[in-house]
Amino acid sequence: GSEMCIRDRFFTEYYGNPSSVYNFAQKSKMAIEDAREIIADSIGAAKSNEIYFTGGGSESDNWALKSAAFGLRDKGNHIITTKIEHHAILNTCAYLEKNGFEVTYLDVDSEGFVSLEDVENAITDKTILISVMLANNEIGTIEPVCEIGEIAHKHGILFHTDAVQAMCHVPINVTEMNIDLLSASGHKFNGPKGVGFMYMKNTAKLEPFIHGGAQERARRAGTSNVPGIVGMGQAVKLALGTLDKDTHTIINMRNYIVDRILGEIPDVTFDGPCIDADAYVNAVSVGLPMCSLKRLPSNMHFCFKDVSGDSLLIMLDMNGICASSGSACALSLIHI
């Protein structure tokens, strides 16, 4: 669509290096800054210079956790997260544990929600960072990040959220949601693969993760992926332009499928938060959408008793239905 057309022009016409001073290159630089403005506005960032472009969600997660941990080490060495985070968070935490940090992994309830009381009780005088995903990629649970951010700030603790699964699928406002650091990836909202961003509140001031040149205000070295960044900016613009309409359509389709499967196939369980058909409408009306939503509108997760998952996926695939028995990052481990 239009995202691809605009992106492709920066492969074929405006291919100058945005770090150079000549006019041809400045067209690329202007396009990057336009994308930065679009993304900043889309998540309610106070300033566009709080958006840093990266190679994807995994890099953003690594940057947030490692730079926060090592940068705040003089204040403490304790990090709080959950057991249901993406591998980019869990494996980074494991790395930090090997380097002298202590990590508390919180349990979640049967619907995937982390307890606010558990978050509060896990905090110590050594806690420097709390990282809880905004929305789970397998069962769709939207965590109470607004309240978790409040708890973190009450104790003077930095709060990071992995919003890879949520970006452009539900409304996000980093200011109202008390978020200091946020990770996202373009491929999750019809943007290009291999490009993402991190929101870093100006007061956070994390150290660079990738060292080298002065790109991204000397916070993230490396020649900018201009087509990827421009494409991601356009994808955000397109997705948010039809978010309300698309969400209602998706919710209706999702609920139809859930009702048919649960009503016609025996011994099936629907995992994750219960579906509230009016949740999105009600949430939008109160002005803080995310704090009222419990599940991603597009998410479904079923368990079929006495059925081979691989066989079921093959049959679905043969009928033109794309489904998975786990997250893509976890499935790739099977083939190692």
Q: Residues of each region from the PLM?
A:
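Pyridoxal 5′-phosphate
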Residues: 1-3, 7-333
